[in-house]
């Protein structure tokens, strides 16, 4: 009866929950609901109507905080992800009344932003129904994402740790990245190092933490059923609901869009084979996630020395082998397994903040129950017990987490951005990879005003139409071969243009093979004219024309060489963007951040020279040596320009993600050391690496190698012995020990 009387609350809750399942209709429904409830309340004075109206008004006020997003976007800031502005006026400043309709197309970009579609075209709710990770990795203990692992880390000095991926979707737990947490004389191993391969232990610890919460809720149920239901539902939504909704990836499965794209691509290829009369016994395209799972099991069996034939005989795996065989019989390179979506790029504990805050409230309630029990049984122990519990509740999390959360002297991201930008030539275009190597650069440019002449192009965002369009408007303005309509129509890959020929790599290979001879003929013709030039001015003009032609020839040559072994694949938008920007901006230096995988350079890396923290395209230069480094420019940057505040002196805490980023510094030092002919200068750069990264064994090995080349055996031995004391990784230690034993044996 009570539930029936509260029907307005149930209807109101269902409609207001549309902020999750139909965000584009939320404002319309909520406003209509508010009007209806207000009229109903005036007519009935029903308290359930008034409470429902209050909920609706508060929900609208809460949602209104997001309106700063389109207001900010309307001002066209340089960093304007998804471009979510809402245009209420035309170019002449007149109001457009239809644009006030919150269900209109004018609001679409705003809603897409709220649904995080700047990271993909799929809504968060839709994505939640396609699991992007193994469920145990999402719930128990796993790096960057696990609810249970972060739950433990809230209170205890046991951090989650890391895994290393050495094949697609296949990971291992290694010592590197799982260094124990030191607190005075105590060392606390990471959860991955201690129980990473023991799911039973993970489950037991998870049950311990959450069993206490269940116990607290059960007590609440016994004392007040309604309060108990409220607490259990709220915590379930904050925890299990968030795990399901956020749906973090563990690096073992594909994104839904990539899954659909790969299956569609394989269907297309196999149908082409069938049209060409090739015999095929492939009954259906295998599920790529299933293939990755089978491959993981095969590797696991082989690592244990067990027979993996039961997995290799799987129907899906056999179909995949047949597809690979068809490619080989057609004279094409066998397609590899698709790349799963990467493991979450950073720690995602902040997404679970509502659950952990509410969890703490429940633990506090449980402590209250405990103290109440103490008062009833041993009243004289109440005050001492309360004080002890209060002190422990504050001291343990402080002990576990203070060092990692103290930001004092943490200059590393600022200096990293400065160093990368200062590596760039004036007015350059520099391609970056993801968040960690991009946002610090944007901060340095827009907040600190450093090197705003450099255009940072993020390749992850380079797959989105809105980001590419902004390059045509926001300074530094770039030139593209398409206008905004063309970007939508054919440049940015989407479901509407998926079947266009230019979305296939073979189209671009054919284009390159058609353009290359044309450019070469023109260059040969100009070279012939150069031989007969009579004045220095004529020679200079002809050389300038040849240089202009060498630039696109170089780009198309790189594209062809990159594309031939990938002919059967899709031409991702970011690949087209790299080629397009390089072709249409000949006056701008083209750089690639050293954080970017070379495969993303679409073959241009073959003609690039490392200068500090970037690879610079040597335009039109076909004679450039592979993996070249400009020694003098890089040495000048390291010695006279770069900043390294807090590195090597113990003043800055460097977490795992930052350490991985900073290893780009170390690769520079090692390349410089190995490229120097002067032993003293070579050891100088190895010493910089040792100072900043004392646990990196390669620095000691390089220093010893350089000293040996100069005949300084004793000093080489000193470096190897020093490395053995500092280096904790077993593989590095073994190498240094092997080198040391070899030198001692010779003596």
Language-model segments: which ranges?
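Extracytoplasmic/lumenal ectodomains and periplasmic regions of secretory and membrane proteins
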Residues: 305, 309-320
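Residues that form or flank phosphate/diphosphate-binding pockets in enzymes
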Residues: 439
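ER/secretory pathway lumenal C-terminal domains and tails of membrane proteins involved
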Residues: 1-293, 300, 317-427, 443-744
């Amino acid at each position: 009866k009570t539930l029936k009387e509260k029907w307005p609350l149930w209807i109101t809750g269902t409609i207001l929950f549309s902020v999750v399942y139909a965000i584009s209709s939320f404002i319309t429904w909520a406003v209509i609901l508010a009007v209806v409830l207000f009229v109903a309340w005036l007519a009935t004075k029903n308290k359930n109507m008034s409470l429902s109206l209050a909920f609706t008004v508060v929900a609208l006020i809460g949602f209104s905080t997001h309106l700063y997003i389109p207001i900010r976007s309307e001002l066209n800031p340089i960093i304007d992800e998804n471009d979510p502005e809402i245009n209420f006026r035309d170019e002449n400043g007149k109001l457009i009344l239809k644009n006030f309709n919150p269900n209109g197309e004018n609001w679409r970009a705003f809603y897409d932003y709220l649904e995080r579609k700047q990271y993909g075209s799929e809504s968060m709710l839709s994505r939640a129904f396609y699991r992007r990770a193994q469920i145990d990795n999402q719930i128990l203990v796993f790096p960057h994402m696990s609810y249970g692992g972060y739950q433990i880390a809230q209170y205890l000095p046991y951090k989650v740790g890391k895994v290393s991926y050495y094949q697609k979707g296949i990971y291992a737990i290694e010592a590197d990245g799982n260094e124990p947490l030191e607190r005075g004389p105590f060392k606390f191993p990471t959860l991955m190092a201690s129980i990473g391969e023991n799911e039973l232990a993970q489950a037991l610890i998870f049950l311990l933490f959450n069993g206490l919460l269940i116990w607290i809720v059960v007590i609440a149920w016994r004392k007040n059923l309604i309060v108990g239901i409220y607490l259990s539902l709220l915590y379930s939504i904050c925890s299990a609901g968030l795990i399901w909704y956020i749906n973090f990836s563990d690096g073992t499965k594909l994104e839904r869009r990539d899954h659909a794209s790969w299956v569609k691509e394989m269907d297309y290829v196999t149908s082409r084979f069938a049209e060409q009369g090739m015999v095929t016994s492939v009954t259906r395209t295998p599920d790529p996630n299933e293939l990755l799972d089978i491959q993981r099991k095969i590797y696991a069996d082989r690592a244990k020395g067990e027979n993996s034939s039961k997995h290799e005989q799987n129907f899906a795996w056999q179909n995949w082998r047949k597809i690979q065989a068809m490619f080989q019989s057609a004279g094409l390179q066998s397609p590899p397994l698709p790349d799963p979506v990467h493991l979450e790029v950073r720690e995602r504990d902040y997404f679970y903040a509502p659950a952990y805050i509410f969890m703490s409230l429940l633990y506090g309630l449980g402590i209250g129950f405990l103290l109440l029990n103490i008062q009833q049984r041993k009243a004289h122990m109440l005050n001492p017990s309360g004080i002890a519990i209060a002190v422990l509740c504050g001291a343990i999390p402080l002990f576990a987490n203070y060092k990692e959360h103290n930001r004092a002297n943490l200059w590393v991201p600022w200096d990293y951005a400065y160093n990368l930008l200062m590596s760039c030539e004036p007015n350059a275009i520099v391609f970056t990879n993801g968040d960690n190597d991009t946002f610090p650069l944007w901060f340095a440019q827009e907040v600190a005003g450093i090197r705003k002449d450099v255009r940072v192009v993020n390749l992850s965002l380079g797959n989105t139409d809105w980001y590419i369009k902004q390059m045509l408007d926001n300074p530094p303005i770039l030139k593209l071969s398409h206008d905004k309509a063309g970007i939508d129509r054919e440049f940015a890959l989407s479901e509407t243009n998926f079947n266009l020929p230019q979305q296939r790599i073979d189209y671009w290979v054919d284009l390159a093979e058609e353009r290359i001879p044309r450019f070469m003929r023109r260059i040969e013709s100009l070279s012939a004219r150069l031989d007969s030039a009579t004045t220095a001015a004529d020679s200079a003009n002809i050389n300038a024309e040849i240089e202009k032609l060498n630039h696109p020839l170089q780009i198309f040559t790189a594209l062809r060489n990159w594309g031939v072994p990938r002919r059967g694949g899709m031409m991702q938008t970011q690949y087209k963007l790299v080629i397009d920007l390089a072709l249409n901006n000949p006056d701008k230096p083209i750089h690639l951040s050293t954080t970017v995988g070379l495969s993303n350079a679409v073959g241009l890396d073959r003609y690039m020279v490392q200068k500090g923290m970037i690879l610079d395209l040597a335009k039109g230069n076909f004679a450039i040596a592979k993996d070249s480094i400009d020694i003098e420019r890089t040495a000048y940057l390291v010695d006279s320009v770069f900043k390294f505040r807090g590195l090597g002196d113990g003043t800055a805490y460097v977490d795992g993600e930052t350490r991985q980023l900073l290893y780009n510094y170390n690769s520079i030092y090692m390349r410089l050391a190995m490229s120097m002919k002067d032993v003293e200068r070579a050891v100088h750069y190895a010493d910089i690496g040792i100072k900043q990264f004392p646990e990196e064994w390669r620095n000691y090995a390089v220093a010893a190698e350089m000293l040996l080349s100069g005949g300084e055996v004793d000093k080489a031995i000193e470096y190897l012995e020093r490395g053995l004391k500092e280096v904790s990784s077993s593989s590095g230690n073994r190498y240094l020990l092997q080198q040391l034993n070899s030198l001692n044996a010779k003596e």
